[in-house]
Design a protein with these regions (language model features):
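Single conserved hydrophobic/aromatic residue that forms the stacking wall/gate
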Residues: 1-12
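Ligand/substrate-recognition segments at binding pockets and active sites
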Residues: 25
């Protein structure tokens, strides 16, 4: 509602940060368009999955009727699903996750498809440290990389199970010189957390 969007705008102005709106596909096209008209004045960075990602026609309708980018793809798993989003111009930012799309090679193929259509890539970083490292490597190797999307600080358990890990500085990830993905699992530490399921 209008009161909430005003409050959100006030927080955004104080924080001096980008405003990324995610709905996890829980809206109708009409409600997403209506919400977008309310929040447009705050210059959102994107509206993520305004409708279910398997309904590319509905998502394209939203994309045509709002004045800031639609982002989608965190739940998509194949280049064919991404191709449908691309062809229908349903999103201008694709959020692939190397752990879901079949790995680095498939991720790079999707990124190339997006690049050929002037779309950006924002790898989805809601994952464990190995997939995060793969997302980072792909991000560093493509020309249409936008941001790494995530809310974790990559401290705590993720760092405990790794011997070598990537480092963050001023909001950016620093690639290291280590081979492969640039990370190394601490197998002794992992053994201290047995799965009994």
């Amino acid at each position: 509602d209008n009161t909430r969007s005003r409050g959100l705008g006030d927080v955004y102005k104080r924080q001096q940060c980008d405003l990324l709106i995610g709905t996890h596909g829980q809206m109708t096209p009409e409600s997403a368009i209506r919400l977008s008209s309310e929040i447009e004045k705050y210059d959102p960075f994107w509206l993520e999955e305004p409708v279910p990602p398997n309904n590319s026609d509905a998502m394209a309708k939203v994309a045509r009727h709002i004045n800031f980018p639609v982002a989608a793809g965190e739940r998509l798993t194949t280049k064919y699903e991404f191709n449908e989003i691309i062809n229908k111009q349903a999103a201008s930012i694709l959020q692939l996750n190397m752990g879901r799309v079949g790995g680095i090679l498939e991720g790079k193929k999707i990124a190339s498809m997006a690049e050929a259509n002037h779309l950006s890539i924002a790898p989805h970083m809601y994952c464990g440290p190995i997939v995060a490292a793969a997302n980072i490597q792909v991000a560093a190797s493509i020309s249409n990389f936008l941001i790494l999307e995530g809310i974790k600080d990559w401290k705590g358990f993720d760092c405990k199970i790794m011997k070598k890990y990537f480092k963050w500085e001023a909001g950016s990830v620093l690639l290291n010189e280590a081979p492969g993905l640039g990370v190394e699992i601490d197998e002794d530490m992992i053994e201290s957390f047995p799965y009994d399921g």
